[in-house]
C-alpha cells in the first residue's frame, strides 16, 4: 500500500481511522509516501480497484469520499468532504460535510484540490493545479483540450 514514487519522497504516511468509521478497498490500492489519510468518526472512505495515489496527498473524510476503479492521482493532491474544521453558529455545530464521489478511470493532476460536494464523472481528467469546488458530474469524459475552459470559465 505504500508504494509509488520510489525514492522521491521521504515523508511518513499517516492513515488514521476513527471509531465507527469504514474504509473499503475494492482491490489493489497504492498510497505513496508522505500522504495523510484521515477517516473521522462515522465517515466512509472507499477505494476502487487499482487506485493509485502519488506522494504527499491529503484525504480527509468527515462523511463520505469514494474513488472509482482505476483512479490515478498525482503529487500533492487534497481531497476534502468538509471545511477542515467545525463551524459554530449560535452555539451549535453546523453540518459542513458533503460527499465527494470520483468516478472510474479518472486522472487527477498534481497539486489539484477537490472540495466537498463534488461529483466527478467517469473518465474525467483534472488538470494540474485546479481547485474543483462544485459538482462537475456532468462533464464530458474527454476533459482534455478544448473542454479545459469548462473548469476555468468561472475564474476568468
Question: What kind of region is each of these model predictions?
Answer:
Residues 1-80, 103-105, 112-114, 122, ...:
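Domain-scale signature associated with acetyltransferase and cell-envelope carbohydrate enzymes
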Residues 56, 97-99, 117:
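Short basic coil micro-motifs at the edges of alpha-helical modules that engage polyanionic partners
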Residues 92-103:
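Glycine-rich NAD(P)-binding loop of Rossmann-like domains
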Residues 101, 119, 128-129, 133-134:
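Active-site/ligand-binding-proximal alpha/beta "capping" segment
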Amino acid at each position: 500500500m505504500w508504494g509509488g514514487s520510489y525514492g522521491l519522497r521521504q515523508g511518513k504516511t499517516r492513515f488514521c481511522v476513527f471509531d465507527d468509521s469504514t474504509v473499503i478497498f475494492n482491490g489493489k490500492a497504492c498510497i505513496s509516501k508522505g500522504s495523510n489519510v484521515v477517516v473521522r468518526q462515522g465517515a466512509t472512505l472507499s477505494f476502487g480497484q487499482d487506485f493509485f495515489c502519488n506522494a504527499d496527498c491529503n484525504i480527509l473524510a468527515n462523511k463520505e469520499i469514494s474513488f472509482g476503479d482505476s483512479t490515478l492521482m498525482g503529487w500533492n493532491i487534497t481531497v476534502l468532504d468538509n471545511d477542515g474544521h467545525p463551524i459554530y453558529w449560535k452555539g451549535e455545530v453546523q453540518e459542513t460535510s458533503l460527499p465527494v464521489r470520483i468516478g472510474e478511470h479518472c486522472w487527477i493532476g498534481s497539486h489539484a484540490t477537490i472540495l466537498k460536494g463534488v461529483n466527478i464523472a467517469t473518465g474525467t481528467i483534472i488538470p494540474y493545479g485546479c481547485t474543483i469546488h462544485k459538482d462537475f458530474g456532468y462533464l464530458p469524459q474527454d476533459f482534455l483540450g478544448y473542454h479545459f475552459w469548462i473548469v476555468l470559465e468561472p475564474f476568468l
